[in-house]
């Protein structure tokens, strides 16, 4: 029998070699696998996945545009109405998304373009305001460009808010005018809403909504909306309902369904609601009338009343009335003299008999008063007409009247804004009220703003009441003179310290000073070589009693309390611990707070071109300046650059660098120069040395010696 044939190597592969001691060697590794199927390209992925990739990546708008240009599939993924451009809008301007619903079909690419254009336009307008209105207050006709905007107003507002949210100490002039523009835009929008509100039928005018409109108009930069205020009121209603349930679980106000309009008809059930309200408001939540600071304007703003839980009779009454009506008890406002009240009918509904009502004092913890007790409250007898129901318009009129009185009582520049705002509101409700029209004309005349508007108001007054021709004629004459003087004014007055007539001026614009007598902190924004005020002012301020009288330099200063003052040089001194001055007009004159001083904006620097150099020389002598250097220089790889940045030198240096020998000799004179030398040694040791320059040698008499370590 023949032996089987051995398989060939071609069939079985090479024969395995025997290893030592007859052990077989391991088989060779298998050959690498051949190329598999290629992964799908980006364009082959599903559209939803492409959208997700484009939304999740760190892509900006330019990247998305380039991506859409690569192929048809990616262009479809980046379509204008798709998620990609919606995400781009959200990433760039997240605050805008509150204006859209998830189900809206929006051209997001077009929205992005419109918002971008609105931002450019907003910055152009803001940048133009400083040059146009530096010398005068911004008149209402200065906002003409804004009234004719082609872009959506909320896009424009969003850009203004982004300017206001810039780093705190920088961009002060931009913030100043952005705030004014935003103030104007929002007030115009609120005035439109108020006029719509006043045209509604009386039974559709919510007292709470009217109070919110007043709050919004006087505080247009605050985040106040009817929905948030109503939500806070609803929380109080829920607490009252919970307490009421513990007393009477079957009360109709407890079983009331959401959105249901309830009217509780039985007097006893109404009393239970009012008792529960009094407990929750005054005992549990601690609401109370503000007797300590009664004339604070915050007491009139409904949002502040809800925050601080205190107010005046009318604001607390609006809150009390709103809560009661939501719980089914109909209370009515009473325009009682000197003390606003509510009335609660305990007889036939709609009764004209004043004795059929109990009168509720929301300021007095909800106490229920009789007619006689109401008279005791104000100290004198009143006729029946004062117990009648007030309309929503009359309630708003009284609220605005309170703000008007507060504006008249105070005399700072900030309160003039309150007076102007409350006058605007009053005249929006009663446009032909001669008394308030005359007050508005006098206010504008006193402030020296918008003389053309003053003439329009005076002409309107003359048409309404010819008997006012005397006062009208006087104001017309002086207003026309003011307009003529403004036309004759040449360019801005440039003042130089180097001129001989200014040799006695010791201080410069931007320095933070302290008043020797009154102790207030302030910043200089202008100066005169002698007092430029009239004789009456000089006499009233007793300037002649000063040792140097009126023939010494005087300075225009912005004070930390919000006022603007004119101070004699001998009454001012350097503030050795300079701080920011929280004045509302700081951005009108200054662009930045540099830590030890303010940097003038372009308009102010043009008028005082030499002051920056002098200000920088002066601030180097303050302890705060040396402390600032002690913090920066020893740890900085480039002390010179950091020194320049913190001082606001903009690439300049106050004096040429000294030689090495002068540098060494100067160490014994000033602790600051010793500090700088030490800084350079540290950086040389750490191989971070730079060419460090040395500021001018300080006057020894102005440099307090360091003590301790």
Labelled PLM ranges:
Residues 231-302:
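Secondary-structure boundary elements
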Residues 393-410, 432-443, 471-482:
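Amphipathic alpha-helical repeat scaffolds of TPR domains
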Residues 315-383:
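Hydrophobic/aromatic-rich core segments of domains that either
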Residues 2-3, 9-11, 16-159, 167:
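Skp1-binding F-box subdomain of Cullin-RING ligase substrate receptors
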Residues 475-509, 518, 531, 643-646:
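Mixed-charge, Lys/Arg-rich low-complexity intrinsically disordered regions
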Residues 520-528:
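Short beta-strand-centered aromatic/proline hotspots
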Residues 375-378, 410-420:
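Helix-turn-helix repeat elements of alpha-solenoid scaffolds
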Residues 551-554, 558-658, 671, 675-708:
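Intrinsically disordered, low-complexity, charged/polar segments
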């Amino acid at each position: 029998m023949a032996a089987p044939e051995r398989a060939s190597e071609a069939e079985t592969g090479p024969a395995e070699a025997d290893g030592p001691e007859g052990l077989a060697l391991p088989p060779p590794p298998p050959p690498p696998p051949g190329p598999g199927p290629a992964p799908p390209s980006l364009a082959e992925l599903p559209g939803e996945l492409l959208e997700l990739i484009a939304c999740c990546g760190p892509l900006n708008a330019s990247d998305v545009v380039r991506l859409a240009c690569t192929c048809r599939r990616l262009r479809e993924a980046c379509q204008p109405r798709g998620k990609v451009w919606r995400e781009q809008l959200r990433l760039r301007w997240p605050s805008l998304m509150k204006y859209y619903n998830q189900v809206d079909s929006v051209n997001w690419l077009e929205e992005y373009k419109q918002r971008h254009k609105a931002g450019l336009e907003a910055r152009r307008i803001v940048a133009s305001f400083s040059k146009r209105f530096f010398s005068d207050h911004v008149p209402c006709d200065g906002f003409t460009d804004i009234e004719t905007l082609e872009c959506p107003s909320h896009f424009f507002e969003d850009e203004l808010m982004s300017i206001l949210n810039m780093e705190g100490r920088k961009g002060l002039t931009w913030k100043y005018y952005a705030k004014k523009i935003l103030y104007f835009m929002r007030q115009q929008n609120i005035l439109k809403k108020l006029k719509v509100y006043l045209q509604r039928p009386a039974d559709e005018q919510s007292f709470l909504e009217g109070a919110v409109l007043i709050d919004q108009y006087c505080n247009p930069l605050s985040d106040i909306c009817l929905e948030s205020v109503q939500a806070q009121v609803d929380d109080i209603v829920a607490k009252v309902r919970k307490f009421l349930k513990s007393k009477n679980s079957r009360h109709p106000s407890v079983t009331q369904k959401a959105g249901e309009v309830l009217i509780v008809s039985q007097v006893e059930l109404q009393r239970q609601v009012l008792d529960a309200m009094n407990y929750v408001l005054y005992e549990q939540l601690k609401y109370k009338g503000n007797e300590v600071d009664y004339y604070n304007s915050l007491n009139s703003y409904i949002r502040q009343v809800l925050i601080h839980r205190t107010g005046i009779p009318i604001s607390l009454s609006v809150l009390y009335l709103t809560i009661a009506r939501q719980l089914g008890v109909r209370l009515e406002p009473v325009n009682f003299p000197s003390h606003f009240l509510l009335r609660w009918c305990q007889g036939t509904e709609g009764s004209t008999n004043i004795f059929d009502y109990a009168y509720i004092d929301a300021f007095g913890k909800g106490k229920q008063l009789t007619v006689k007790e109401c008279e005791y409250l104000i100290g004198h007898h009143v006729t029946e007409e004062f117990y009648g129901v007030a309309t929503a318009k009359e309630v708003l009129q009284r609220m605005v009247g309170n703000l008007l009185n507060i504006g008249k009582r105070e005399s700072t520049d900030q309160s003039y804004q309150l007076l102007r705002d409350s006058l605007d509101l009053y005249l929006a409700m009663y446009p032909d009220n001669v008394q308030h029209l005359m007050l508005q004309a006098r206010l504008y005349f006193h402030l020296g703003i918008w003389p053309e508007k003053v003439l329009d108001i005076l002409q309107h007054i003359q048409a309404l009441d010819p008997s006012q021709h005397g006062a009208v004629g006087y104001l017309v004459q002086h207003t026309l003179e003011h307009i003529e003087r403004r036309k004759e004014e040449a360019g801005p007055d440039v003042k130089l310290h180097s001129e001989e007539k200014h040799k006695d001026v010791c201080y410069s614009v931007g320095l933070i000073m302290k008043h020797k007598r009154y102790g207030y902190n302030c910043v200089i924004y202008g100066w005169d070589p002698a007092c430029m005020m009239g004789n009456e002012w000089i006499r009233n301020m007793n300037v002649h009693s000063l040792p140097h009288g009126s023939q010494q330099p005087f300075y225009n200063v912005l004070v930390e309390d919000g006022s603007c003052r004119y101070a004699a040089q001998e009454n001012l001194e350097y503030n050795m611990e300079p701080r920011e001055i929280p004045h509302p007009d700081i951005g009108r004159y200054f662009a930045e707070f540099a830590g030890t001083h303010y940097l003038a904006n372009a308009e102010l620097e043009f008028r005082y071109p030499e002051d920056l150099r002098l200000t920088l020389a002066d601030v180097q002598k303050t302890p705060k300046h040396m402390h600032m250097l002690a913090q920066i220089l020893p740890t900085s790889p480039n002390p010179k650059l950091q020194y320049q940045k913190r001082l606001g030198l903009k690439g300049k240096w106050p004096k040429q660098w000294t030689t090495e020998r002068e540098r060494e000799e100067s160490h014994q004179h000033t602790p600051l120069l010793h500090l700088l030398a030490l800084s350079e040694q540290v950086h040389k040791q750490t191989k971070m040395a730079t060419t460090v320059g040395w500021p001018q040698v300080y006057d020894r008499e102005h440099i307090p010696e360091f003590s301790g370590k």
